[in-house]
């Protein structure tokens, strides 16, 4: 190819054959290979090919021919036109991602700012760098890709001087790619600033920010600092090292902010927010059970706090995030665990699973980052933007992310909006080249050849047309709450066959093998963009367009203690939706997708450009948004009926911002330039040109058509003849017209016709020709010197700069490999020069770089502590009660050893009330443990103290140890040895064992003769006894066969006395020492009675210190001396009286007695006494005193048996009680009115349907039962797709169109939470032939509630009905919700609320038997003293897990034994809330019982601030309610009905089971404290069975000992089968035998297996659970109310919920309300009765009276109601069949003109005629009244009473 085409830069100058896609590609390729990447489209556009090398280096090594050179050239042209023509200039960058747009844009901005070298220009340069740091990232196609649209505006004053003066600038960011924050595509990076932070902070800063913890995402493990951290939000760890100097980038980022006048503290807070975002990515979630009781907990009712919740696994990371956000750890965790959103005008809280919580956390991270970017940009604009009126002209740089055919982050919305913006800018490009001057050319009569081109107007109109474009439809459907499929249908209707650029898939699809088409749930729409077709899935697009920030997160940051976070969420970029009734209640919000400011020229109406004089920019359009004070809240539109109910979505905002850009670019007097950026290949390889890739881009951008157009008409300037001739100056001829003169000049210039043409009024020129005619080459290319008059100049802070060197020469390459200026989005190259910082900024920046930016700021620990603090408001002040003071004294006595500071610091309990609760818990545990210790002592230690263990053997006992069936024992001189163990050790071993075994069970003393002189010292002081003295032995305790004779053959082998030939005096002593040490088992036992018997038989036996001595043989003379064989006996025998006579007399005179005191009283010296004691022990000792049969030992022996008998007797009574209920009561046909209340929380649809159906199907008159459902808050439970109230209403058949107004009522809560709001629905529920009226109360909360709106707990749900009935019976003023309840029950359902006599309470997961209601009511009618009755509750999930299996038998026995036993005496102490019926009022007197003042007041206690009250009201509200019934209605009974059955769900996991039992056990303990003071508890001598019940309850605290007691019995039985413990053990075993009889008699055979499982689980029930429960007694969610110490010992109750003012809730009596209701109905028949329904149908319509259900089959007015005692109401009732009437209204003649009023007979006749032809299914008294008014032609309001009474009478047959 020749060199001429290669050197041709202007593509419009190419020959016609080369002006095709292929030809232009070849030409660009030739230039590319010649290192000439820049081509032009005349002077209107540039084509730049990315070289992936240095963008500032041209073919000759200089800037000429490079991208930087092209940018500088364009800047020069823009500056020249701005200066000469005062035109607005705009540069628009077009191209795909990775083509180098951001780099060239940086060069262009740098070049433009060089012309105004002022501090302001430096700030704008820094602003551009900050913008890029926050919004650019590394993508697959580019090292630095822009992910937000940029409209950079430079503002100039061109009227005050010869040169334009830079007076301001704006950085308008459009649609940051928020999805990238939490979703980093593979191989890409997140926004650069996050990597800057991680790499550029110092060690101290990292420590503060928590960036050196080494937490690994996904594992939670810690690693060393040297290992590579895995940050979830930073992508793969390899992205941390991709050749970008992040550390240096962070320093420049901080420097830029400091030069933009951001304070150091603010920069530090920004870094904390960025660190918090990184840490949010590290959060790990898991599913747990809510086992910590809370005041607002409804807790799954049947699961008793087992609600599944999502919690954070790594709490340390959570703490860091909370500290940086200035919120509490627990508050943040809760906010992430659920999400509140708006569904059909309702706030609904969704309980999130771990996946949902992760998405919620990601949304928080995206929100924080988006708001941070918006805040930084707005603060920059505040510092750089000029006053709009002063702006004459602007230079705008527009750069949006390139076209994308796929979404890298998965965000369809981001892809759609970015492509829409690209489509819009490309369309503007086409309009600029092809259409913009067409009309002017035609007007000027200039003919130019037409050029065909691809017009993308169809796509632009289809996407961007206001009102019915795709983006507008998307926003409209979002705001109207439509579904994705409805969106697809709307798009199909709008575009199908109407716009070829947009196609929508079919709404139906026929699946393979299917015969019919089904709905297509995966619909997509295809947009034919100029760059190609893109398919956009519809699924999730509406929700993504909303970009809703839930009210929970808004509520979270509202409590933040961080001023910076408050500022972050208080800026205008956050669009808030506030409640129309409470402007402070933010329901939800979203981050704006449009900048907070507008382009300056978009706000102008237009104006004539002028060189000098007045402002030429045109007037500011006041209708448009201003830059100051733009309201972002939807509340200002809420009361406008034409405005939408919700805020604009992202699409509408982005559409508005595109419209503003388009207005700015298309404004008159604006000259656009275009930079078309191309990439040479798809693989980012330098010096490689892919012709196919480039040709596709050229074809997409239409460069060939653009070149052809410029070849035909390259006109960018139109100059009127006068201006043109004035510019030509000396070249103008002096003769001829202006047109002729202009033509002559053009002829002289010889310009081509496509660049210069003469029109009728002026001349069309190209920019090249214009520059020649005005000689613009010398103007504008040199930077302007600063003007002294420019207020933005600061001479002191300027750094000298010459015009030839500037920002583009920087050697700092932040976003590229150091040392190589690659062709990328190099912000550093554009923004930082080596000499562009003023001295002041340098000083501040260097100080920031060198030190710790967090120095002198709050530490992370201080931030965390501050975040956990809350602002409190005193709400109540009460003195301590005397009992409370006494209790606290005892608490401190027991816990004095633990100082308060230790609890606060070590226990981490900052609040005083929590520390006090901990002390109380420890004190209670001490008391419980002491009680257990006392029981242990009583059972084990006390008997041993009374009767110490004796190791003695009576004759019979010793005889039994004969070795035959037991061990072999033998007795020797009163000692019993283990012969069986000794036999193997006997010497010599040749003696057969059988020979020794014959001595088992005998006294073998005679086998062992003793040497008296060796064992006794006698009476002589020298201690010598003659060796010949002997002593016979005869044990008197045994019969002959048990006593071995002295003549036994084996005796000779043990005789080593002096008289034998083998004398061994010490042998016996040695043997006894050996035997006692190894084989001793005890002693021979002599009972006192037997000793007396021996004494009577002339035996001299007595005992000293319980040791028995026998002197019988000694006294009888058995002391004959013996001499060795062969030795002669001496004449004088030795003295054989070796014992003192006084000692001998003691035994002879007091034989059989205890001679201890006499022994002690003997008048003998100590030496003699000691010698006598030795003789007694060695020679006369025969055994121990056996006291085992003494009274005290008998008591100790049978005390265990007595305890066992007592336990067994109680259970035996229970057994008998259970048998008492064996008879079957036959239910009667009953006519009492009952209410069945079902509180619902987060149960699933199946559970709710089962509960409601079972209640509706009960065999009880449908007209006399009312289904009353209370939904506790607008919450979507895990696994549910709708909020619980909606599930309930769908089950009951209430359509979504029914939406009553929320009404105020009192709730149980803290501070302001006592004010709640609810909606009331009523109607009929039809199921399986039953038609049951129902009331549904939905607690929706006040407008200010954003998280869990309306939720207050189960007790509050109970109180709604209890308080309502209380006020009905006492005729008290009611809240609006209660008045509406009264109206619905009385006027719509048709029953006076006072008629209801019984209230059946079941849980939402409980199924009741069909005959349960009948049996309950029957029992209460038979015994009017019954105030409450419960039935048997079994399990529906018995086999779900081993945990549930353990509970089956326990449930059965607890009802059929415990409750049956308690019921015998009318004292069932715990009526389960899941299945109990209460008596509302007394049958005889009508006195309120269940809803009496005392019970309602005590049960509605809101001050639950002590451990005791929390255990009562938050753990065991059912038991406490029963306690209150016993306390205030002691004469009434609480009973158990065995035949009434219900089935509930038991906890199936250990955590939930433990939580439930912890509640039950602790509530039992604390209710016991409440029961003790009751006067009626104990009868005479405690014979009342309530005392036995008390003992039964008391056993709760000693349950762990029971297990120990059973183990003790087992050990006793095992060690001593003959003991009484065996009997006790048998008795306890019989307990289960009795229980077995019960279920055998009732044929409950399966209970045998369940009983075995229960026995095996006894250690868990009785040992583990109580210990865990007692220690976790203070494990509560303590809420926000606490006590602080006031003056004089008073306790001031404070709360951060604010103070509740009861006057906020209006109250009025029913009579007043009814009067107002009648008046309101007169004015508007549909007022206050949205829920009316025709009885027996599903047709909803307003109903005004009891006849809202009028029909022939189910006429509520024909009910037979028993006589009701008057309750003191001032209501005037008109009698009717059902005992109900309406309030009388008196109208006097002075009030109403009755002259034309028909008489009663006429009215009655017309009523008869109307009823004869009317449909009784739908007719109402209002419709009858309206028909009468039509017939008579007069108002009938004054006859309303008569019309109603007459209608009733006719329908009931009375007339």
From Swiss-Prot:
Transmembrane parts of this sequence: 887-907, 922-942, 1199-1219, 1587-1607, 1621-1641, 1650-1670
Record GO biological process: chitin biosynthetic process; fungal-type cell wall organization
Catalytic activity: [(1->4)-N-acetyl-beta-D-glucosaminyl](n) + UDP-N-acetyl-alpha-D-glucosamine = [(1->4)-N-acetyl-beta-D-glucosaminyl](n+1) + UDP + H(+)
Functional note: Polymerizes chitin, a structural polymer of the cell wall and septum, by transferring the sugar moiety of UDP-GlcNAc to the non-reducing end of the growing chitin polymer.
Membrane topology reported for the UniProt record: Multi-pass membrane protein
Region called Actin-binding, residue ranges: 658-682
EC number: 2.4.1.16
Keyword tRNA-binding applies: no
InterPro entries for the chain: Chitin_synth (IPR004835), Cyt_B5-like_heme/steroid-bd (IPR001199), Cyt_B5-like_heme/steroid_sf (IPR036400), DEK_C (IPR014876), Kinesin_motor_dom_sf (IPR036961), Myosin_head_motor_dom-like (IPR001609), MYSc_Myo17 (IPR036037), Nucleotide-diphossugar_trans (IPR029044)
Chain's gene name: CHS5
Subcellular location: Apical cell membrane; Cell septum; Cell tip
Keyword Transferase: yes
Family affiliation: In the N-terminal section; belongs to the TRAFAC class myosin-kinesin ATPase superfamily. Myosin family. In the C-terminal section; belongs to the chitin synthase family. Class V subfamily.
Binding site for ATP: 95-102
Species per Swiss-Prot/TrEMBL record: Zymoseptoria tritici (strain CBS 115943 / IPO323)
PROSITE patterns: CYTOCHROME_B5_2 (PS50255), DEK_C (PS51998), MYOSIN_MOTOR (PS51456)
Domain annotation Cytochrome b5 heme-binding: ranges: 950-1008
Region (Disordered): 585-650
This protein's GO CC annotations: apical plasma membrane; cell septum; cell tip; myosin complex
Descriptive protein name: Chitin synthase 5
Residues carrying sugar: 221, 520, 558, 662, 1037, 1061, 1422, 1456, 1562, 1755, 1767
Domain DEK-C: 1797-1852
Domain notes: The N-terminal myosin motor-like domain (MMD) does not seem to have motor activity but is indispensable for polarized cell wall synthesis via binding to actin that ensures the proper localization to the hyphal tips and septation sites near actin structures.
Myosin motor domain location: 1-778
Molecular function terms, GO-annotated: actin binding; ATP binding; chitin synthase activity; cytoskeletal motor activity
Alphabetic keyword roster: Actin-binding, ATP-binding, Cell membrane, Glycoprotein, Glycosyltransferase, Membrane, Motor protein, Myosin, Nucleotide-binding, Transferase, Transmembrane, Transmembrane helix
């Amino acid at each position: 190819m020749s060199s001429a085409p290669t050197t041709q830069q202007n593509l419009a100058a190419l020959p016609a054959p080369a002006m095709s896609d292929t030809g232009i590609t070849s030409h660009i390729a030739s230039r590319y290979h010649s290192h000439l990447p820049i081509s032009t489209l005349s002077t209107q556009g540039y084509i730049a090919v990315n070289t992936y090398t240095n963008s500032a280096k041209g073919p000759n090594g200089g800037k000429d021919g490079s991208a930087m050179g092209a940018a500088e050239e364009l800047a020069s042209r823009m500056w020249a036109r701005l200066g000469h023509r005062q035109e607005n200039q705009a540069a628009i960058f077009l191209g795909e991602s990775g083509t180098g747009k951001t780099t060239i844009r940086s060069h262009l901005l740098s070049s433009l700012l060089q012309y105004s070298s002022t501090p302001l220009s430096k700030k704008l340069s820094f602003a551009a760098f900050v913008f890029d740091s926050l919004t650019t990232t590394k993508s697959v196609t580019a090292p630095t890709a822009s992910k937000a649209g940029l409209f950079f505006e430079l503002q100039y004053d061109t009227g005050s001087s010869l040169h334009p003066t830079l007076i301001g600038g704006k950085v308008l960011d459009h649609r940051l790619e928020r999805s990238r924050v939490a979703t980093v595509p593979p191989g890409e990076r997140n926004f650069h600033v996050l990597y800057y932070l991680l790499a550029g902070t110092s060690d101290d800063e990292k420590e503060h920010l928590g960036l050196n913890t080494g937490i690994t995402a996904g594992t939670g493990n810690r690693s060393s600092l040297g290992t590579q951290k895995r940050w979830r939000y930073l992508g793969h760890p390899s992205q941390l090292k991709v050749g970008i100097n992040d550390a240096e980038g962070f320093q420049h980022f901080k420097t830029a902010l400091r030069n933009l006048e951001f304070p150091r503290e603010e920069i530090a807070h920004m870094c904390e927010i960025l660190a918090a975002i990184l840490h949010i990515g590290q959060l790990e979630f898991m599913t747990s059970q809510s086992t910590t009781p809370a005041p607002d907990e409804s807790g799954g009712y049947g699961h008793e706090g087992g609600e599944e919740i999502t919690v954070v696994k790594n709490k340390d990371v959570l703490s860091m995030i909370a500290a940086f956000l200035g919120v509490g750890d627990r508050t943040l965790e809760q906010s992430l665990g659920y999400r509140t959103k708006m569904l059909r005008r309702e706030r609904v809280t969704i309980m999130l699973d771990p996946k949902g919580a992760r998405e919620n956390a990601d949304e928080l991270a995206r929100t924080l980052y988006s708001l941070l970017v918006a805040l930084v940009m707005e603060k920059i604009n505040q510092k750089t933007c000029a006053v709009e009126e002063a702006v004459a002209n602007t230079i705008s740089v527009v750069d949006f992310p390139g076209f994308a055919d796929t979404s890298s982050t998965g965000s369809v919305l981001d892809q759609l909006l970015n492509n829409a913006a690209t489509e819009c800018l490309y369309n503007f490009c086409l309009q600029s080249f092809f259409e913009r001057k067409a009309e002017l050319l035609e007007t000027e009569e200039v003919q130019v050849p037409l050029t065909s081109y691809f017009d993308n107007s169809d796509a632009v109109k289809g996407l961007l047309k206001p009102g019915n474009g795709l983006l507008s439809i998307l926003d409209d459907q979002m705001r109207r709450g439509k579904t994705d499929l409805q969106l697809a249908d709307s798009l199909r209707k709008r575009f199908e066959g109407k716009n070829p650029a947009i196609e929508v898939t079919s709404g139906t699809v026929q699946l393979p093998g299917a015969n019919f088409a089904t709905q297509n749930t995966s619909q997509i729409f295809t947009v034919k963009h100029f760059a190609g077709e893109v398919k956009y899935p519809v699924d999730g697009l509406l929700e993504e367009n909303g970009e809703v920030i839930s009210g929970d997160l808004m509520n979270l940051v509202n409590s933040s203690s961080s001023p910076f976070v408050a500022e972050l969420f208080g800026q205008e970029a956050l669009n808030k939706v506030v409640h129309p009734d409470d402007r402070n209640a933010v329901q939800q919000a979203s981050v704006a997708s449009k900048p907070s400011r507008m382009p300056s020229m978009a706000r102008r109406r237009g104006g004539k450009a002028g060189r000098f004089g007045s402002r030429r920019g045109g007037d500011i359009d006041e209708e448009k948004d201003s830059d100051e004070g733009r309201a972002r809240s939807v509340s200002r539109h809420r009361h406008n009926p034409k405005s939408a109910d919700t805020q604009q979505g992202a699409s509408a905002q982005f559409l508005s911002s595109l419209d503003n850009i388009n207005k700015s670019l298309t404004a008159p007097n604006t000259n656009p330039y275009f930079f078309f950026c191309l990439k040479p290949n798809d693989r980012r390889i330098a010096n490689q040109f892919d012709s196919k890739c480039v040709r596709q881009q050229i074809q997409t951008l239409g460069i060939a058509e653009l070149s052809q157009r410029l070849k035909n008409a390259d006109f960018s300037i139109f100059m009127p003849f006068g201006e043109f001739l004035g510019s030509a100056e000396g070249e103008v001829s002096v003769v001829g017209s202006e047109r002729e003169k202009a033509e002559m000049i053009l002829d002289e210039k010889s310009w081509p016709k496509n660049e210069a043409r003469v029109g009728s009024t002026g001349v069309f020129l190209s920019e090249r020709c214009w520059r020649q005619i005005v000689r613009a080459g010398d103007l504008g290319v040199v930077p302007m010197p600063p003007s002294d008059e420019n207020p933005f100049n600061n001479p002191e802070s300027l750094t000298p700069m010459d015009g030839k060197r500037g920002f583009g020469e920087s050697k700092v390459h932040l976003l590229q490999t150091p040392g190589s200026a690659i062709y990328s989005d190099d912000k550093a190259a554009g923004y930082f020069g080596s000499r562009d910082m003023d001295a002041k900024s340098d000083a501040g920046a260097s100080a920031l770089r060198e030190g710790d930016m967090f120095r002198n700021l709050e530490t992370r620990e201080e931030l965390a502590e501050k975040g956990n603090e809350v602002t409190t408001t005193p709400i109540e002040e009460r003195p301590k009660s005397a009992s409370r003071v006494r209790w606290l004294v005892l608490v401190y006595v027991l816990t004095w050893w633990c100082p308060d500071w230790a609890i606060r610091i070590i226990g981490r309990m900052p609040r005083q009330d929590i520390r006090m609760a901990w002390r109380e818990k420890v004190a209670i545990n001490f008391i419980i443990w002491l009680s257990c210790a006392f029981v242990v002592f009583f059972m084990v230690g006390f008997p041993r103290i009374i009767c110490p263990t004796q190791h003695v053997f009576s004759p019979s006992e010793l005889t039994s140890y004969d070795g035959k069936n037991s061990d072999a024992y033998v007795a020797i001189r009163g000692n019993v040895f283990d012969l069986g163990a000794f036999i193997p050790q006997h010497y010599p071993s040749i003696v057969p064992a059988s020979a020794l075994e014959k001595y088992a069970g005998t006294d073998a003393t005679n086998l062992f003769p003793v040497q008296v002189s060796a064992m006794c010292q006698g009476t002589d002081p020298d201690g010598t006894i003659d060796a010949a003295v002997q002593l016979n032995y005869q044990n008197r305790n045994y019969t002959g066969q048990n006593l071995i004779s002295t003549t036994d053959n084996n005796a000779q082998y043990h005789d080593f006395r002096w008289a034998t030939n083998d004398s061994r005096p010490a042998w016996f002593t040695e043997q006894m020492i050996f035997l006692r040490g190894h084989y001793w088992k005890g002693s021979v036992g002599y009972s006192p009675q037997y000793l007396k018997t021996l004494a009577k038989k002339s035996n001299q036996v007595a005992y000293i210190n319980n040791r028995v001595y026998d002197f019988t043989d000694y006294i009888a003379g058995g002391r004959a001396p013996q001499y060795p064989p062969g030795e002669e006996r001496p004449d004088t025998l030795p003295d054989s009286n070796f014992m003192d006579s006084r000692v001998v007399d003691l035994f002879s005179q007091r034989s059989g007695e205890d001679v201890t005191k006499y022994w002690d009283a003997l008048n003998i010296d100590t030496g003699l006494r000691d010698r006598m004691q030795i003789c007694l022990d060695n020679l006369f000792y025969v055994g121990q005193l056996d006291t085992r049969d003494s009274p005290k030992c008998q008591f100790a022996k049978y005390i265990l048996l007595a305890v066992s008998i007592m336990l067994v007797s109680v259970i035996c009574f229970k057994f008998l009680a259970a048998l008492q209920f064996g008879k079957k009561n036959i239910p009667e046909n009953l006519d009492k009115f009952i209410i069945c209340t079902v509180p619902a929380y987060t149960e699933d649809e199946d559970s709710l349907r089962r509960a409601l159906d079972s209640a509706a199907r009960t065999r009880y008159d449908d007209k006399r039962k009312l289904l009353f459902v209370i939904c506790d808050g607008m919450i979507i439970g895990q696994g549910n797709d709708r909020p619980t109230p909606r599930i309930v209403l769908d089950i009951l058949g209430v359509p979504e169109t029914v939406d009553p107004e929320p009404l105020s009522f009192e709730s149980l809560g803290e501070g302001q939470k006592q004010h709640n709001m609810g909606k009331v629905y009523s109607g009929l529920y039809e199921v399986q032939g039953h038609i049951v009226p129902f009331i549904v109360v939905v607690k929706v909360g006040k407008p200010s509630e954003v998280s869990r709106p309306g939720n207050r707990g189960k007790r509050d749900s109970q109180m709604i009905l209890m308080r309502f009935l209380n006020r009905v019976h006492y005729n008290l003023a009611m809240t609006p919700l209660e008045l509406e309840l009264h109206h619905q029950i009385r006027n719509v359902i048709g029953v006076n609320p006072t008629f209801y006599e019984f209230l059946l309470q079941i849980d939402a997961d409980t199924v009741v038997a069909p005959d349960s209601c009948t049996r309950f009511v029957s029992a209460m009618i038979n015994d009017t003293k019954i105030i409450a009755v419960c039935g048997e509750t079994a399990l529906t999930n018995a086999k779900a897990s081993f945990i549930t299996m353990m509970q089956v038998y326990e449930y059965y026995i607890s009802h059929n034994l415990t409750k049956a036993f308690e019921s015998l005496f009318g004292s069932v102490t715990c009526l389960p809330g899941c299945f109990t019926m209460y008596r509302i009022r007394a049958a005889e007197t009508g006195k309120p019982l269940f809803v009496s003042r005392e019970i309602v007041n005590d049960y509605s206690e809101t001050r639950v601030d002590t451990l005791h009250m929390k255990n009562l009201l938050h753990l065991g509200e059912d038991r406490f309610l029963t306690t209150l019934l016993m306390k205030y209605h002691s004469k009434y009974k609480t009973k158990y009905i065995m035949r009434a059955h219900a089935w509930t769900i038991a906890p199936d996991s250990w955590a939930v089971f433990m939580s439930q039992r912890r509640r039950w056990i602790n509530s039992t303990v604390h209710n016991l404290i409440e029961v003790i003071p009751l006067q009626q508890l104990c009868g005479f001598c405690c014979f009342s069975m309530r005392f036995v019940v008390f003992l039964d309850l008391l056993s709760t605290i000693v349950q762990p000992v029971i297990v120990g007691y059973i183990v003790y019995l087992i050990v006793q039985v095992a060690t001593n089968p003959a003991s009484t413990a065996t009997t006790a053990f048998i008795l306890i075993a019989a307990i289960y035998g009795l229980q077995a009889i019960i279920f055998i008699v009732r044929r409950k055979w399966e209970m045998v297996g369940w009983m075995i499982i229960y026995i095996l689980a006894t250690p868990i029930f009785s040992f583990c659970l109580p210990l865990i429960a007692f220690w976790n007694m203070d494990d509560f969610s303590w809420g926000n109310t606490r006590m602080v110490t006031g003056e004089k010992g008073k306790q001031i109750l404070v709360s951060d919920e604010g103070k509740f003012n009861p006057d906020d809730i209006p109250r009025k009596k029913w009579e007043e309300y009814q009067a107002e209701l009648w008046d309101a109905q007169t004015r508007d028949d549909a007022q206050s009765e949205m829920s009316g329904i025709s009885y027996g149908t599903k047709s909803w319509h307003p109903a005004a009276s009891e006849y809202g259900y009028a029909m022939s089959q189910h006429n509520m007015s024909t009910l037979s109601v028993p006589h009701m005692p008057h309750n003191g109401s001032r209501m005037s009732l008109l009698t009717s069949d059902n005992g109900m009437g309406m309030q009388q209204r008196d109208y006097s003649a002075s009030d109403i003109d009755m002259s034309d009023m028909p008489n009663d007979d006429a009215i009655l006749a017309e009523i008869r005629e109307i009823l004869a032809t009317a449909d009784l299914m739908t007719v109402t008294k209002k419709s009858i009244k309206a028909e009468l008014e039509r017939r008579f032609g007069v108002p009938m309001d004054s006859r309303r009473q008569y019309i109603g009474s007459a209608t009733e009478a006719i329908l009931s047959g009375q007339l």
